[in-house]
């Protein structure tokens, strides 16, 4: 209505500014192509797609795994653990302040979307950027077509109705085509770049997960699992946003601001350009400074979020302990305290965001009002047309879109970089337990020919001799565990390691597995220093039943198969029978497909230990360790199970090392090594240590346990005697009552 009532004062100033590239003035003024920015819909779709497909590690350690309904067969080869995905120019290990900087993270991230020797990725990135440029070219023409439509409507076409219809129709079609083309190119760009972005997220998450698996045990003992999984989760989401922001936000914003400033300067003079420049400068300075001030609130919220996740994970993992000690309210209060810190930080984030948005809107609205006033003055004086006024309005509003995104993108970019900070810190953690370059595999003596030597008493030809030479080690420099310890575990024999608590028994297992490196000395297996062989070959040849059986939240079948991933179902059922799990499994409704629960909490401790033994037997390792492996079993089951395992080990000539507190379980060992205060104080067989050294530490431990057992048996005998006496008393009372009843009945009959 407004346009119809406008009367042109001077027809001569009417100028048709043709869209690119049809008119020289415009084609000269606009030399940078840009793309229409994300609409709210496309932005949310892209972000949600990125977020939903991000890899979450938390599911690996904290979430409930999905049950598997069908067992694997031998026809499927075991999945091979791939090494971390490498770009040829990966960053060096180690953490430093420069590596943890934002520039380092962005540089590392760029390598994931532009990897060397990956032409497919590069082609996709180039196509996506080309579509970005094409969409920007179409998008910038939309306000020019709209201006020409308005100016055309203000010309008297009374005598040229046909020409008017043709011109207006062409401009309207061009307007609609340019707008639709810009949106279409933007969506195509999103679709093509999506695989690049998601692949980059997968690469970073995978490399981080593999890095965590390769970290030493001390690292994991000093970290909380909830914080690690939350760092990976937030970091992958941050990568998704940073990639979309850098490729589709920062570059288009820069192009769009440059184009609009150039158009205003060329067509409408320096005053409009100066106003635009001052607005951009004030807007950017305000946004950057305010966002830098708000960053500390986001960091506080992240720390509180990690703390809440750790409390929740600890409470759920130790669910039984919480219930046993009736401490639900205590755990809930701890969780609520962490949530309160997160709430306080989140409120600060929200209020500071409101301040930031208000300031940004004030700056932009002030600039828009001033520019509209200048444009109306130009229309009034006849220097500008109504179409020019509309063009200025649309260009400034078109500038408002990237300006609004500039604020939100900068805020989200800073937040995403904070979220990525912990993720990249994990990637740059130094690995303490390393192999030497080109480390050879561990090769055992006579490894392939040990089944035909039943009459050979020379154990040197058997595989699996372990020798400690002057080994010293401590978890902390001020608390040594092993002090110049030297001993030999002969190949093919059953050897027991005993001693008081804290003497270093379980530490020996960790050192043989190279979970830690020793401070001095050497550990040899068949004469080979374990620090100079590959970790994979070392751990492949060693099996263990630990004190606390680690089980996955999976089926019984898959937990046993974990000992050897290529094992067939028949082999698994055979070891199930050997460890006497078949009766239990037969009584379960789902059999071997029964889910054992988080950390195996749905089965008993003894059943978990037998499952761990089945896993060990399936692995068929030539060197085996038992760390209090039967502590949760009753005496009858323990003896039957140990008899079966001894038979298997004897047939296969396996080196068997047992760590035990209950000395009766290792009395038949070929050799017993006694530790005390980190040193080997005694060695020998059970009878040698008792008879030849009656005052030995082993003899003292044995006598203490035997006396306790005797006292226990006597107590049991006393209890049984008391029960028998009570029973006799009850029987006597019952007989007396029956006699009285009989006499009374007889008297009544008489």
From Swiss-Prot:
Enzyme Commission number(s) from the entry: 7.-.-.-
Any single GO BP term: transmembrane transport
Any Pfam family matching the protein: ABC_tran
Binding positions for ATP per the UniProt entry: 475, 499-510
Location within or outside the cell: Mitochondrion inner membrane
Keyword Membrane carried by entry: yes
Transit pept. (range): 1-16
Source taxon at top rank: Eukaryota
Disordered, as annotated region: 43-100, 437-462
Keywords, comma-separated and alphabetical: ATP-binding, Membrane, Mitochondrion, Mitochondrion inner membrane, Nucleotide-binding, Transit peptide, Translocase, Transmembrane, Transmembrane helix, Transport
CDD domains: ABC_6TM_ATM1_ABCB7
Topological type in the membrane: Multi-pass membrane protein
Annotated GO MF terms: ABC-type transporter activity; ATP binding; ATP hydrolysis activity; ATPase-coupled transmembrane transporter activity
Ranges of compositional bias, category Low complexity: 43-75, 87-100, 445-460
Family membership noted in the UniProt record: Belongs to the ABC transporter superfamily. ABCB family. Heavy Metal importer (TC 3.A.1.210) subfamily.
Function: Performs an essential function in the generation of cytoplasmic iron-sulfur proteins by mediating the ATP-dependent export of Fe/S cluster precursors synthesized by NFS1 and other mitochondrial proteins. Hydrolyzes ATP. Binds glutathione and may function by transporting a glutathione-conjugated iron-sulfur compound.
PANTHER family linked to this entry: ATP-BINDING CASSETTE SUB-FAMILY B (PTHR24221), IRON-SULFUR CLUSTERS TRANSPORTER ABCB7, MITOCHONDRIAL (PTHR24221:SF402)
Record-given protein name: Iron-sulfur clusters transporter ATM1, mitochondrial
Gene assigned in the entry: ATM1
């Amino acid at each position: 209505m407004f346009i119809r009532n406008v009367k042109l004062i001077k027809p001569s100033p009417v100028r048709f500014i043709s869209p690119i590239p049809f008119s020289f003035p415009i084609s000269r003024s606009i030399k940078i192509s840009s793309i229409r920015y994300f609409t709210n819909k496309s932005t949310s779709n892209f972000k949600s797609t990125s977020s939903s497909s991000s890899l979450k590690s938390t599911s690996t350690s904290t979430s409930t795994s999905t049950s598997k309904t069908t067992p694997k067969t031998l026809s499927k080869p075991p999945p091979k653990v791939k090494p971390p995905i490498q770009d040829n120019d990966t960053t060096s290990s180690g953490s430093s302040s420069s590596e943890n900087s934002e520039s380092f993270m962005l540089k590392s991230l760029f390598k994931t979307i532009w990897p060397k020797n990956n032409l497919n990725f590069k082609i996709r990135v180039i196509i996506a950027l080309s579509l970005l440029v094409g969409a920007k070219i179409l998008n910038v023409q939309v306000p020019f077509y709209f201006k020409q439509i308005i100016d055309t409507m203000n010309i008297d076409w009374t005598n040229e109705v046909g020409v008017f219809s043709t011109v207006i129709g062409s401009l309207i079609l061009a307007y609609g085509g340019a707008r639709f083309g810009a949106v279409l190119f933007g969506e195509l760009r999103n679709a093509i770049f999506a695989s690049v972005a998601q692949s980059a997220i997968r690469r970073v998450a995978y490399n981080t997960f593999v890095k965590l698996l390769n970290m030493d045990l001390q690292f994991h003992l000093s970290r909380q699992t909830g914080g690690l999984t939350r760092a990976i989760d937030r970091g992958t989401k941050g990568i998704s946003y940073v990639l979309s922001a850098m490729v589709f936000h920062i570059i288009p914003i820069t192009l769009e601001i440059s184009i609009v400033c150039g158009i205003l300067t060329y067509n409408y003079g320096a005053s409009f350009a100066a106003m635009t420049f001052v607005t951009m400068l004030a807007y950017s300075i305000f946004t950057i400074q305010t966002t830098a001030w708000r960053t500390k609130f986001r960091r506080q919220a992240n720390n509180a979020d990690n703390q809440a996740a750790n409390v929740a994970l600890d409470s759920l993992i130790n669910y039984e302990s919480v219930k046993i000690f009736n401490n639900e309210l205590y755990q809930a209060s701890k969780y609520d305290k962490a949530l309160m810190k997160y709430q306080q930080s989140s409120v600060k984030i929200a209020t500071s965001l409101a301040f930031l948005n208000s300031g940004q809107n004030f700056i932009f609205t002030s600039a828009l009002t001033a520019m509209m006033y200048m444009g109306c003055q130009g229309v009034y004086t006849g220097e500008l047309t109504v179409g020019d006024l509309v063009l200025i309005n649309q260009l400034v509003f078109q500038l408002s879109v990237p300006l609004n995104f500039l604020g939100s993108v900068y805020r989200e970019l800073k937040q995403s970089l904070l979220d990525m900070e912990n993720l990249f810190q994990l990637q740059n953690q130094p690995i303490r337990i390393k192999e030497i370059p080109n480390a050879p595999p561990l090769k055992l003596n006579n490894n392939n020919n040990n089944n035909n030597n039943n009459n050979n008493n020379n154990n040197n030809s058997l595989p699996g001799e372990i020798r400690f030479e002057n080994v010293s080690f401590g978890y902390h420099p001020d608390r040594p565990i092993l002090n110049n310890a030297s001993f030999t575990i002969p190949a093919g024999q059953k050897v027991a390691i005993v001693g008081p608590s804290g003497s270093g028994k379980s530490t020996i297992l960790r050192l043989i597995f190279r979970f830690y490196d020793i401070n001095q000395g050497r550990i040899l297996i068949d004469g080979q220093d374990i620090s100079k062989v590959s970790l994979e070959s070392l751990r492949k040849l060693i099996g263990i039943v630990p004190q606390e059986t680690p089980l996955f939240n999976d089926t019984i079948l898959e937990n046993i198969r974990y000992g050897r991933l290529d094992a067939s179902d028949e082999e698994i059922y055979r070891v199930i029978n050997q460890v006497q799990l078949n009766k239990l499994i037969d009584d379960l409704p789902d059999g071997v497909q029964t889910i054992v629960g988080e950390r195996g909490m749905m089965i008993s401790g003894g059943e978990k230990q037998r499952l761990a033994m089945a896993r060990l037997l399936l692995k068929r390792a030539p060197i085996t360790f038992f760390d209090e492996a039967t502590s949760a079993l009753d005496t009858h089951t323990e003896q039957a199970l140990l008899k079966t395992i001894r038979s298997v080990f004897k047939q296969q000539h396996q080196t068997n090392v047992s760590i035990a507190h209950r000395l009766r379980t290792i009395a038949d060992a070929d050799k017993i090594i006694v530790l005390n205060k980190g040193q080997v104080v005694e060695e020998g067989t059970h009878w040698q240590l008792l008879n030849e050294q009656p005052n030995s530490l082993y003899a003292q431990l044995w006598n203490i346990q035997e006396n306790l057992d005797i006292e226990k048996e006597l107590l049991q005998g006393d209890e049984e005697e008391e029960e028998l006496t009570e029973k006799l008393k009850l029987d006597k009372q019952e007989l007396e009552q029956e006699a009285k009843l009989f006499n009374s009945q007889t008297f009544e009959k008489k």
